[in-house]
Structures are given as structure tokens and as C-alpha cells.
UniProtKB/Swiss-Prot annotation:
<dbReference type="InterPro" id="IPR000412">
    <property type="entry name" value="ABC_2_transport"/>
</dbReference>
<keyword id="KW-0812">Transmembrane</keyword>
<feature type="transmembrane region" description="Helical">
    <location>
        <begin position="239"/>
        <end position="259"/>
    </location>
</feature>
<keyword id="KW-0762">Sugar transport</keyword>
<keyword id="KW-0997">Cell inner membrane</keyword>
<feature type="transmembrane region" description="Helical">
    <location>
        <begin position="176"/>
        <end position="198"/>
    </location>
</feature>
<feature type="transmembrane region" description="Helical">
    <location>
        <begin position="65"/>
        <end position="85"/>
    </location>
</feature>
<comment type="similarity">
    <text>Belongs to the ABC-2 integral membrane protein family.</text>
</comment>
<feature type="transmembrane region" description="Helical">
    <location>
        <begin position="149"/>
        <end position="169"/>
    </location>
</feature>
<keyword id="KW-0472">Membrane</keyword>
<feature type="domain" description="ABC transmembrane type-2">
    <location>
        <begin position="38"/>
        <end position="259"/>
    </location>
</feature>
<dbReference type="GO" id="GO:0140359">
    <property type="term" value="F:ABC-type transporter activity"/>
</dbReference>
<dbReference type="GO" id="GO:0015920">
    <property type="term" value="P:lipopolysaccharide transport"/>
</dbReference>
<keyword id="KW-0625">Polysaccharide transport</keyword>
<dbReference type="InterPro" id="IPR013525">
    <property type="entry name" value="ABC2_TM"/>
</dbReference>
<comment type="function">
    <text>May form an ATP-driven Vi polysaccharide export apparatus, in association with the VexA, VexC and VexD proteins.</text>
</comment>
<keyword id="KW-1003">Cell membrane</keyword>
Amino acid sequence: MNILKNNSYYFMKLITVCELIILLMSRDIKTRYNGNLLNYMMVLAVPLVWISITVISFQYLNRSVPISTDDISFVIAGILPYLLFRYTITATMRTHSFSTSLAVVSQVKKRHVIFSLAAIEFVNAVIIYIIISLINFLIFSRWEAQKPFLIFEGMVIAWLLGLSFGYFCDALSERFPLVYKAVPVMLRPMFLISAVFYTANELPYSLLSIFSWNPLLHANEIVREGMFEGYHSLYLEPFYPLAFSATLFLAGLIFHLICDTENH
């Protein structure tokens, strides 16, 4: 009987947390976009422009994709996980300012805020993927989703990398405010070393031995294996980005505890 009561208690607590997360997501969307659907659509349009420019540059430079697929599908597989990673970091770095506006609500914890801000970016990425895939199918009759679960897995890993990195940077910023300015600079080379517009299989070993330390490269390769029939990454380590994320979460938690102890 006690087991049933405990299970019921934890289930209700989980429902309460989920409702709180959804409420925080709704509040952030209304605050950021002023409750205007057009503003929200403009935010979604930015990644679409990124993808369009990359596809056009492929065609302009006569860059043939290294996989038997079309340019749009190849670009989606590389650039969307990267954008999800980057936008999730940017979103989670707003945790402090967003939490300050909710300081009077004791029920809201920092972990609720950071998760809700990151969750919005994941939802946005899913919407963008669906929009581009439908356009590609309806206009060019191309649909690449051989293993949907692997696509989802790769996107989740890219999201976790962004969430953990953002959480770690948010913790560092409590002691070192310069982190807010340093993060955008640190993210710039990620576009070049994350296998966004090439595959890991194309890289010579001298470069791969360096780039393979980048966990986002592995997330991109997982998405490619899920999208394209017959593609198999020779250098994929699926557990490495998960271990990397766990390390960042742990380091961020330690920094948060240290800062909280000093503040008290």
C-alpha cells in the first residue's frame, strides 16, 4: 500500500513539474515574441535562411554531396543539429535574467527555467525539420528518413550538448561575467569543425584525430545515419557526446553549489 502511495505521489509531482515547464515555456514565448505569431515565424525563418544559403552555396560552388542524396537533405542533416546546439546554448544563457523576473515565485527553481528555455529550442528544431522536409518532398519528391529513431537520437544528443554547455556557462558566469561575451566567440569555429557541410568519412586521419574530440560531430553523424540509407559513419562514438554532456552537467552543478555556498 505504501508503495502505491509513493508511486502516486511521485507521479503527481512529475505532472506538476511538467505543467510548470509548459507554463514557463508559454511565458517565455509570449515575452520574446510579444504574443505575435508573425514574430515567432520570423524566428523560425532565420534557420531556414541559413539552410537555404548553404544549399545555394553548394550549387554555386558545384560542391557534390558525398552521399547519394540531394543537397537539401544533406544540408539539413548537418546544419540542423548544429543550429539546435547553438540556439540551445544561447537560450540557456538567458536563465539568470529570466529567473530574476520570477524571483517572487518560490515554486520556480533555476533548473525549471533552464529546462523550459532549452525545450523551446528543441520544439523549434522539430518544427523546422518538418517544414523543410515537407517542402523538399512536395517540390522535389525527396524524403530522407530511413531510421527516424536515429534522427531523433542525434537531435536529442545535440540538444543535450547545448543544454549542458549552456548550464555550465551559466554557472561560470556567476563568478566570471565575461563568459557571456566569450561564448559567442567560442562557438564560431564549431560551424567548421562539426561536420556540418561534410562527413567524418571524408576527413583525412590527421584532421579526424582532432575534430573527433568535438562531441557535436558525433551527433551530426548519428543524424546522417538515421536519414540516409546505406550511410555508415566509420568514426562514430555514440556514447562519447553523452559522457561529455554528463561531465559538463556535473561541472556546472559543482560551480553552482560553490557559488551558492559563497553567497550564503
